[in-house]
């Protein structure tokens, strides 16, 4: 009987330890920033901030590699994902300048020449003609770490979703998934607009793989 009791006790302790390890980390912040008319609020306090644009916190333009000749658009840039150390260093530098909030760049959208150029993006094409775009898990784990590191260091992030421009992969590339035009992004009855809303849904309901918290939490 004793061996069985010991086994059950060890199992219970193991489960409790695992539960603690999987518990979501608490945020550095108490509130999301809200708007009251023209005023931004942190709880019941007015929130004011200044910061610089930080476009490479979650995807880097790899200028050193030059243009990708497999991209006939005459531009064809290469990209790479930043390391956790790079993200930590950049965010620390921003905080040391006094920044309280920072805008990062939009999520990148897959387009037809990416495969030939070895380019990875945040948003992948639907698996079916009428399906919704998919998030690239590899890219989103980099994004997760950016958010977690910013939270840890007390930096708020402004997270836009889809680009106006094609070079990064934006509204034109999102529309191309459904054989629509870039302008259809603004038509609320278009497949492109529906896809845009679904991208937002996927992001804000995502559970951060570093903190264990949902983005909306």
PLM segments and residue spans:
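Bacterial N-terminal signal peptides that target proteins for export
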Residues: 1-9
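Bacterial N-terminal signal peptides
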Residues: 10-18
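Boundary at the C-terminal end of the N-terminal hydrophobic targeting segment
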Residues: 19-23
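Active-site mouth of glycoside hydrolases
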Residues: 26-217
């Amino acid at each position: 009987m004793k061996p069985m009791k010991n086994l059950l006790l060890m199992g219970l302790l193991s489960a409790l330890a695992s539960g603690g390890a999987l518990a979501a980390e608490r945020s550095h912040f108490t509130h999301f920033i809200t708007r009251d008319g023209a005023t931004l609020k942190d709880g019941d306090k007015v929130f004011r901030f200044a910061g610089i644009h930080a476009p490479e916190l979650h995807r880097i333009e790899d200028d050193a590699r030059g243009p990708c000749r497999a991209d006939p658009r005459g531009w064809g840039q290469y990209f790479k994902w930043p390391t956790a150390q790079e993200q930590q260093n950049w965010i620390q530098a921003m905080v040391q300048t006094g920044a309280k909030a920072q805008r990062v760049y939009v999520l990148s959208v897959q387009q037809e020449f990416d495969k030939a150029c070895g380019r990875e993006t945040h948003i992948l094409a639907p698996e079916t003609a009428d399906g919704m775009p998919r998030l690239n898990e590899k890219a989103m784990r980099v994004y997760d770490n950016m958010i977690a590191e910013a939270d840890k260091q007390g930096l708020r992030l402004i997270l836009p979703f889809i680009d106006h421009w094609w070079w990064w992969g934006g509204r034109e590339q999102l529309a191309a998934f459904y054989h629509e035009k870039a302008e259809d992004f603004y038509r609320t009855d278009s497949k492109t607009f529906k896809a845009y809303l679904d991208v937002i849904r996927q992001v804000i309901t995502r559970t951060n793989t570093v903190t264990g918290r949902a983005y909306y939490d």
